[in-house]
Amino acid sequence: MSQKANYTKINSKMWDEWASAGGEWSLAINHQDFADATQGIFDIYLTPCKPVPHNWFIPFKKAKILGLASGGGQQCPVFAAQHAEVTVFDYSDKQLELEKMVSAREGYSIDLVKGDMSKTFPFKDETFHMIFNPVSNCYIQDVEHVWQECFRVLKKGGVLLSGFANPALYLFGEDEKELQAVHKLPYDGTKSSIENDEELIKNGGVQFSHSLETQIGGQLKAGFTLQALYEDHHHKGKITEYMPCYLATKSIK
């Protein structure tokens, strides 16, 4: 039987399994790419295919940066290579292990914090200059809580960079040959007919579509000012032939 009331633990286990299997968000940066990043040569992704424009970033040197649900050794090592003070907050042990592996290999310090972003963040008010949050809030039921916590822990003038799924992505089933609307929106994974935790993990965990009102409107409601936005496609799947599957936003406190 599934314990969907503890859905974030199911999703944490799913990410552990994805990381162990070498999933695309768990392929840690190699030494050459880290060395390039020390020279300012890098691409970082909030969404699958389109890199974040460099003019979205703050000056990294000595900046306090929070990688929110950003374990895996891909993005945060780049910030460290540019001499930022980096904290990674993630609920997956395996994703955090990849961060630890890269930091040990390259010889930099990083603060690794295991935690559930559906709860109150374990950080003081106005701690960080920037939050980097790649696609991940589809695994959290209350996304407006996440925006409120981001606003709280950012310093005044701080930057929130976030990637998230186009809600319409959840309208369709998994058929790769033909698109068919099968779910009403907003999609709520806790109402899935699947009752076995292992089966949920195989099917991508317990996910939530949210809405643009709670994604973008939720940032504004929390107090942010939206400064920039772009759309992105996925690198595979039938639906990406017809519409962008992801969005990324830059917002300012």
Residue ranges with predicted function:
Residues 222-224, 238-253:
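Core SAM-dependent methyltransferase catalytic element
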Residues 144-159:
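A short glycine-rich, Lys/Arg-flanked "PGG" loop and its adjoining helix->strand segment in the class I
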Residues 118-131:
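A short acidic, Gly/Pro-enriched loop at the edge of an enzyme's catalytic core
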Residues 129-144:
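A short SAM/SAH-binding and catalytic strip from SAM-dependent methyltransferases
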Residues 159-193:
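Conserved class I S-adenosyl-L-methionine
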Residues 28-63:
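Conserved alpha-helix/loop element of class I SAM-dependent methyltransferases that forms part
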Residues 206-229:
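Short alpha-helix
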Residues 58, 63-120:
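Class I SAM-dependent methyltransferase SAM/SAH-binding core
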